[in-house]
Amino acid sequence: EVSGEHKNKIVPQIEGTKKALSFVKKYPDRFGMLIRCRPRFEKNIQELDTFISKHREFIYGLKFHPYTSQLKITDPRNYPYFYLAKKYNLPILVHTANDKYSKLIYMDRVCKKFNDLTFIAAHCELLSDHLITIEVLKNNPNLYCDTAWVDMKFIKLLKANDLMDRIMFG
């Protein structure tokens, strides 16, 4: 079975999160962290809830990578994590790309269903012309995007569409 995860040994979520936290705690004035959620591979919502509660000041959001998890963001297995984000007022960053798991149109659906949460579409649908981003941003006030792997021409197009307040640079 294809797991969707990298072939290298994957560190369990809580173990990896603890390692990241130890680094962030050394430089709390310079770093915060996002917790990567992998609901297809790990069922640890209670443990994660306890961890966030204990270390909330260092945790800036949750992160999903649909392609490597081979799980669309619209999949109900993600929902317990969304409720956790709501509980702790955390944004949810989702890697988006032009593949069968990561399309920005899935963000449109989840932003509408969970309109009380804040979502960030990383890469504005990588490996595409990014144009769907404009429509999805306009339709969802709870959605932001970042500029990682996005060319300057598209950023200018976002500006022309009066969407600069919805961009995270980086």
Give the label of every model feature segment:
Residues 1:
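Catalytic domains of carbohydrate-active enzymes, especially glycoside hydrolases
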